[in-house]
Amino acid sequence: RASFVLYPKDQGVYISARSLGEVNVQVIVEALGGGGNSTTAGGQLNVPDIAVARTALLRAIDEYFEK
């Protein structure tokens, strides 16, 4: 169980991720250029809008669970 928040700021979209420990959000957020640890992670995506960021996040989540 994990949650992800995307929000526009400055010249990109920020991501904040939290996990109860079952999902390593660090791995998912690192795939998007961010960082953190297994239960908390975040970063900035240099994308034009939230729709593009959402697509990238969903792709990273899919890749995480395919491993």
PLM regions and their residue ranges:
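Gly/His-enriched, cation/cofactor- and phosphate-binding structural elements
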Residues: R1-K67
